[in-house]
C-alpha cells in the first residue's frame, strides 16, 4: 500500500510519544511498561491505516496490542484514527517488520497477526514475503513458547505458499479457512481495510492459524 505523503504526518507522530514509538530498541523487553496493565502482547506486522488493530484492541481489552508499520504517512493515519478514542491497550511502532528481534525480547510477544501482506509474486522476491522462513524464525524467537501466528489474505498464490512455508518450518496448523466469510470462524472476525474492500467484491478471504 503506497500512500501519498501527508505533510502533517511527522508532526503528529512527534506530538504523541505516549502512543507511538519511533525507536523500538529503547523498549525491548519493557513494552508492557507503555500500557496501563501488564497483559499478553499481540502485534500486527504491517498495520496499515489501523482498522484491524484498533478494533481488536477495543474488542479484547484483556490483551495489549502493538501495530507495526514501516511507512510513516500510513502509520500516522493509523495513529490519527486511534486518537479519536481512548484505547489504553493500544500502541504503535514505526519500524521495519524485518527487524523485530531488535525491538522485542525473546518470548515477549504472545501472538503475531499478518494481514494482507504484500504477496511479492516474483520468485526473486521470495525472501521479502512475511511468511518466508527467515521471518518465521524471527516470529518464533520473539513469541512465547507455542506462540501463534494468524494470517489473512485475498491472494491465493501467497496463501498456498504460506501453507507450504509454515508446514516446512514445522509449525502446527490450528485452522485453515479457504472462504473465511462463509465459515463459522467469521463470527469473531475483525476486518481490515483491504479485507472489507475485497470481500465486498465477492473475493474469498483466506485465513490460517498456526503455532510453533
Swiss-Prot record:
- Known SUPFAM superfamilies for this protein? S-adenosyl-L-methionine-dependent methyltransferases (SSF53335)
What is the reaction catalyzed? guanosine(46) in tRNA + S-adenosyl-L-methionine = N(7)-methylguanosine(46) in tRNA + S-adenosyl-L-homocysteine
Q: What does this protein do?
A: Catalyzes the formation of N(7)-methylguanine at position 46 (m7G46) in tRNA.
- InterPro entries in alphabetical order: SAM-dependent_MTases_sf, tRNA_(Gua-N-7)_MeTrfase_Trmb, tRNA_methyltr_TrmB_bact
**What protein name is recorded for this chain?**
tRNA (guanine-N(7)-)-methyltransferase
Q: What one GO molecular function would you report for this record?
A: tRNA (guanine(46)-N7)-methyltransferase activity
Entry annotated with the keyword Kinase: no
Please spell out the taxonomic lineage of the organism that makes this protein: Bacteria, Bacillati, Bacillota, Bacilli, Lactobacillales
Q: Which residues bind substrate?
A: 122, 154, 192-195
Q: Family, per the entry?
A: Belongs to the class I-like SAM-binding methyltransferase superfamily. TrmB family.
Q: Which Pfam families match?
A: Methyltransf_4
Q: Which keywords has UniProt assigned to this entry?
A: Methyltransferase, S-adenosyl-L-methionine, Transferase, tRNA processing
The UniProt annotation puts the region (Interaction with RNA) at: 124-129
Enzyme Commission code: 2.1.1.33
- Kindly list the positions annotated as binding S-adenosyl-L-methionine: 44, 69, 96, 118
Q: Which GO terms describe its cellular component?
A: tRNA methyltransferase complex
Q: Which residues form the active site?
A: 118
Describe which pathway this protein belongs to, using the record's wording. tRNA modification; N(7)-methylguanine-tRNA biosynthesis
Q: Does the keyword S-adenosyl-L-methionine apply?
A: yes
Instruction: Please report the organism this UniProt entry assigns to the protein.
Output: Pediococcus pentosaceus (strain ATCC 25745 / CCUG 21536 / LMG 10740 / 183-1w)
Q: Which PANTHER family match?
A: 3-DEOXY-D-MANNO-OCTULOSONIC-ACID TRANSFERASE/TRNA GUANINE-N 7 - -METHYLTRANSFERASE, PENTACOTRIPEPTIDE-REPEAT REGION OF PRORP DOMAIN-CONTAINING PROTEIN
Amino acid at each position: 500500500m503506497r500512500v501519498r505523503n501527508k505533510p502533517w504526518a511527522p508532526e503528529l507522530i512527534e506530538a504523541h510519544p505516549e502512543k507511538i514509538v519511533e525507536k523500538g530498541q529503547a523498549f525491548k523487553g519493557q513494552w508492557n511498561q507503555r500500557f496501563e496493565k501488564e497483559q499478553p502482547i499481540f502485534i500486527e506486522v504491517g498495520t496499515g491505516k489501523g482498522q484491524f488493530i484498533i478494533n481488536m484492541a477495543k474488542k479484547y481489552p484483556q490483551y495489549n496490542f502493538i501495530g507495526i508499520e514501516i511507512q510513516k504517512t500510513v502509520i500516522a493515519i493509523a495513529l490519527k484514527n486511534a486518537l479519536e478514542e481512548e484505547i489504553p491497550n493500544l500502541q504503535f511502532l514505526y519500524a521495519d517488520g524485518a527487524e523485530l528481534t531488535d525491538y522485542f525480547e525473546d518470548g515477549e510477544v504472545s501472538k503475531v497477526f499478518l494481514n494482507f501482506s504484500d504477496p511479492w509474486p516474483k520468485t526473486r522476491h521470495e525472501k521479502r514475503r512475511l511468511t518466508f522462513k527467515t521471518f518465521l524464525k524471527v516470529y518464533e524467537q520473539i513469541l512465547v513458547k507455542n506462540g501463534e501466528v494468524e494470517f489473512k489474505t485475498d491472494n491465493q498464490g501467497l496463501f498456498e505458499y504460506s501453507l507450504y512455508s509454515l508446514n516446512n518450518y514445522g509449525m502446527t496448523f490450528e485452522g485453515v479457512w479457504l472462504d473465511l466469510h462463509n465459515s463459522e470462524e467469521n463470527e469473531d472476525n475483525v476486518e481490515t481495510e483491504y479485507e472489507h474492500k475485497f470481500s465486498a467484491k465477492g473475493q474469498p478471504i483466506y485465513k490460517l492459524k498456526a503455532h510453533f
